[in-house]
Amino acid sequence: MAHTLATPVAPSVSLICNTKLSVSLSSSSLAFRPVNPKNGGGLSIKCVRVGNVEIPNNKRVEYSLQYIHGIGRSRARQILCDLTLENKLTKELSEDELLQVRDEVTKYMIEGDLRRFNAIAIRRLKEIQCYRGVRHIQGLPCRGQRTKNNCRTLKRGKRVQIAGKKKPPGPK
């Protein structure tokens, strides 16, 4: 385990660095001697930003795009087909290919816009008091699923106790 060195730089800021990295402090500047990248130093980028979401760099593009809310398996494949891109690792994409992917993703309703759209649709159902809206209000499934056994995940927030063996009253 590497030892860390904490050196106060300003009253509210402290510098934490590896002991491999040498630090020279003067009154006016802070200078770092570069570390050999073979020894594990240096900057490594682990994510790519597409559609205001950081997608993983070490996975194939088809699976990386699925980290964006609103893009599933079929939509990710459709994006790759529209751009005629190979399904290679995200870090292997060139800048031009990455720009093409970003432009293609902006054509779809994703992330905040999609969440807002769904929230407005559910709010409208609740306001008009239709069956689906009432089921949303009650926290029950609204697509015809059984409720005797399998709607526990929807009712999780309410914590309804399941009828079972009753405990005998304790001694007073």
Curated annotation (Swiss-Prot):
Record note on quaternary structure: Component of the chloroplast small ribosomal subunit (SSU). Mature 70S chloroplast ribosomes of higher plants consist of a small (30S) and a large (50S) subunit. The 30S small subunit contains 1 molecule of ribosomal RNA (16S rRNA) and 24 different proteins. The 50S large subunit contains 3 rRNA molecules (23S, 5S and 4.5S rRNA) and 33 different proteins. uS13c interacts with translation factor pY (PSRP1).
Family, per entry: Belongs to the universal ribosomal protein uS13 family.
Transit peptide, residues from-to: 1-47
Main location: plastid
Keywords per UniProt: Chloroplast, Plastid, Ribonucleoprotein, Ribosomal protein, RNA-binding, rRNA-binding, Transit peptide
PANTHER family: 30S RIBOSOMAL PROTEIN S13/40S RIBOSOMAL PROTEIN S18, SMALL RIBOSOMAL SUBUNIT PROTEIN US13M
Subcellular localization(s) per the UniProt record: Plastid, Chloroplast
Function: Component of the chloroplast ribosome (chloro-ribosome), a dedicated translation machinery responsible for the synthesis of chloroplast genome-encoded proteins, including proteins of the transcription and translation machinery and components of the photosynthetic apparatus.
One GO term of the biological process aspect: translation
GO CC annotations, alphabetized: chloroplast; mitochondrion; small ribosomal subunit
Gene name for this UniProt entry: RPS13
Protein known as: Small ribosomal subunit protein uS13c
Source superkingdom: Eukaryota
Originating organism: Spinacia oleracea
Keyword RNA-binding: yes
Record GO terms (molecular function): rRNA binding; structural constituent of ribosome
Coiled-coil annotated spans: none
Presence of the UniProt keyword Ribosomal protein in the record: yes
